[in-house]
């Protein structure tokens, strides 16, 4: 009988450890970076819809998404160079917690006016600008962000 109780207690402890270990990852946000470096409006639209689908699937509280834009990808933020629906999609995604990483190298090299880059009706903020889009992608991947290229 004593052996039975010892084995039962050991199994109880083992199952609790397994349960604790399985639940350790709960509450941890999935980290994802979406990469935009094309001026193709269809790619912009598809990528922005992918981000919304991602949020819908896992819940905005369970995911941290950063959209990094560089090179021709900055056309997403320029009136007259992108579809109006994409402006609205980006604004809606920002309201859900999606962050932007807008490449300062591109802004500088293309002599863009930061005040002409916008998200919906709002201008981009200094906090949306990163020194280099490609450097930001590498940094985020080294921090465990999953990489998605629409």
Predicted regions and their residues:
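Secreted/extracellular ectodomain signature
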Residues: 21-150
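N-terminal export/membrane-targeting signals
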Residues: 1-24
């Amino acid at each position: 009988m004593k052996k039975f109780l010892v084995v039962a207690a050991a199994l109880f402890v083992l199952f609790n450890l397994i349960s604790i270990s399985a639940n350790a990852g709960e509450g941890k946000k999935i980290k994802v970076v979406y990469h935009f470096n094309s001026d193709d409006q269809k790619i912009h639209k598809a990528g922005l819809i992918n981000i919304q689908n991602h949020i819908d699937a896992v819940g905005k509280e369970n995911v941290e998404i950063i959209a990094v834009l560089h090179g021709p990808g900055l056309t997403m933020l320029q009136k007259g160079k992108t579809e109006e629906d994409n402006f609205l999609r980006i604004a809606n995604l920002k309201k859900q917690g999606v962050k932007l990483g807008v490449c300062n190298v591109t802004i500088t090299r293309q002599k863009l006016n930061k005040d002409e880059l916008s998200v919906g009706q709002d201008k981009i903020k200094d906090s949306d600008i990163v020194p280099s889009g490609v450097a930001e992608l590498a940094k985020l991947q080294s921090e465990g962000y999953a990489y998605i290229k629409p």
